[in-house]
A protein has these predicted regions:
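Short, surface-exposed acidic-centric catalytic microdomains
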Residues: 37-58
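Glycine-rich, flexible N-terminal cofactor/catalytic loop recognition
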Residues: 2-42
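Structured adenosyl-cofactor binding patch, chiefly the S-adenosyl-L-methionine
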Residues: 154, 158-209
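S-adenosyl-L-methionine/SAH cofactor-binding core of RNA-modifying enzymes
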Residues: 65-84, 95-101, 108-150, 197
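Internal, active-site/partner-interface "lid" segment
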Residues: 183, 195-235
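SAM-dependent methyltransferases
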Residues: 2-4, 224-305
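Short, structured active-site "lid" loops
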Residues: 51-72
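Short linear proline/tyrosine/threonine-rich motifs used for host-factor recruitment
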Residues: 320-322
């Protein structure tokens, strides 16, 4: 039995084919994930298999019928099998790679979760914004059902009724409108599934993700060190792991401030974090008549008191060169 069962109800089953690819395909192959796709028109009646009707009270567009969606969600809650998606291609290389699936242990529900009811997710622009915290919570689920709306959406009574059999969540992936819910399903399914233990071969991969600590992830680099005249930051090849981690933290903080400054307001920042945000590299040359080592020592203390971190001071004759990082220039 898979660790997570996804059922998707849609009028465009072929839209869900990407769930068979890459890591999700491997998760299906290894039995970590199973996906069933249900064609909503299987529950429609009449010659035209219509699933929509004009909105009550008038207005543009069409609304999806409750008498079609209701029975569909009833049957899926009872375990009706859909068209099962298998992996897009068998993975015959026995050598584990960074993105291969590993053995998976069951994960318990969080306190307060009612595991007797599956989770029903309804992608809609009117829903609560989907976050990384949602993805983390839902990765512990055993059964998630997606209801893909189209047109002007699904009759609201469908969700009121579905609460008898599901834990219903209306969710939005952004402040924009799509043609239907299928794209949102792909986004949410991938964000959730990749957090299931074993789906990512490197167990630390998702721990460093953007939003995992409330911040955006900083830039990444790989070989070669110099490409088209552009050099990767020297600290990344220094071999000093502490400096590398400090650099990554600083880049994460600065990118978040530039792109999503509101996230910083929601994140606990340490004294070091605040220094990283405000600091800049400083190089200052000072002429001192009769400079001595005592002067250098006094200057070093003064610089540290002024907020410099690890200042380097060189004395050449009567000239002092100060290099370091500080929130305030010398």
């Amino acid at each position: 039995m898979s660790k997570l069962r996804l059922d998707v109800v849609t009028i465009f089953p072929e839209y869900l084919d990407p769930l068979r690819q890459a890591l999700l395909g491997k998760a299906i192959e290894q039995g970590i994930l199973s996906v069933g796709v249900h064609d909503l028109r299987d529950w429609a009646t009449g010659n035209h298999k219509s699933v929509d009707a004009p909105p009550l009270g008038g207005g543009p567009g069409m609304v999806m019928k409750p008498e079609v969606w209701g029975p569909a969600l009833d049957d899926v809650a009872k375990g009706r099998p859909g068209t099962s998606l298998d992996t897009a291609a068998a993975h015959r290389n026995d050598k584990l790679r960074h993105d291969d699936v590993h053995e998976v242990a069951p994960r318990p529900y969080e306190g307060g979760e009612d595991s007797s009811k599956p989770l029903l997710l309804v992608p809609t622009p009117a829903g609560k914004p989907f976050t990384q915290q949602d993805a983390q919570a839902w990765s512990r689920e055993e059964h998630i059902v997606f209801a893909c709306g189209r047109y002007e959406g699904i009759d609201q009574r469908v969700f009121e009724d579905a609460k008898k059999r599901y834990r219903v969540r209306e969710v939005s992936i952004g402040d924009y409108v799509l043609i239907g819910g299928e794209v949102a399903v792909l986004v949410i399914a991938e964000a959730v599934t990749r957090l299931i233990p074993g789906v990512l071969g490197n167990t630390e991969s998702h721990e460093d993700d953007s939003f995992s600590d409330g911040l955006l992830e900083g830039p990444s680099y790989t070989k070669p060190r110099v490409w088209r005249g552009l050099e990767a930051p020297a600290v990344l090849t220094s071999g000093d792991h502490a400096k590398v981690e400090a650099w990554r933290r600083e880049q994460s903080l600065k990118r978040t401030r530039e792109v999503r400054p509101e996230l910083l307001e929601q994140t606990h920042l340490s004294e070091d974090d605040r220094f990283m945000l405000d600091a800049r590299d400083v190089l200052t040359t000072v002429w001192v008549d009769g400079a001595t080592r005592v002067v250098v020592k006094q200057l070093r203390r003064a610089l540290k008191k002024a907020g410099y971190r690890d200042p380097e001071i060189k004395l050449e004759g009567d000239t002092l060169t100060v290099a370091g990082r500080a929130a305030l220039a010398l």
